[in-house]
Amino acid sequence: MNTVLVDTSAVLALLVPTDVHHKRAQRAFTQLAADEARLITTSYTLVECYALIGRRLGLDALSTFRAEFAPLFDVAWIGSDEHERGLDLLEESNSEKLSLVDAVSFVVARDHDVERVFAFDPHFTKAGFTAVG
């Protein structure tokens, strides 16, 4: 199956016209839709998206994201197992710049045998994933 993990960096690039990756995000998203890719994300990524969209773009943009974009994602709801494995990965990475949200996304992607990510965050390619953005 053509499954792609979606990161906050791609969501923000898609929604923010002034984002440096906006045009690339639009092209990638259009291609993913044409390919009928299964888009998965984590509940942690959604929380991060809601927080950043609300703060940077306002409540109208948050409502639009919730109504039009969030339903496109299959959400992997994070439990204590994924959370703990994300923390382990975070500690093992020895990188102060890697976030728990990203570490948990790595865990979920590997659990689902996902190799491709819709992301502009270099942590994903450094972790061995292929960026589609």
Predicted regions and their residues:
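Short active-site oxyanion
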Residues: 35-39, 72-74, 113-115
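Short, well-structured N-terminal submotif of metal-dependent ribonuclease cores
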Residues: 1-40, 54-67
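Active-site neighborhoods of divalent-metal-dependent phosphate/nucleic-acid chemistry enzymes
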Residues: 75-115
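Short beta-strand scaffold positions
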Residues: 6, 40-41, 77, 100, ...
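Acidic, PIN/NYN-like endoribonuclease modules and their adjacent C-terminal/linker elements
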Residues: 1-3, 46, 106-107, 111-133
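Hydrophobic helix-cap positions at the C-terminus of alpha-helices
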Residues: 31-32, 69, 89, 93
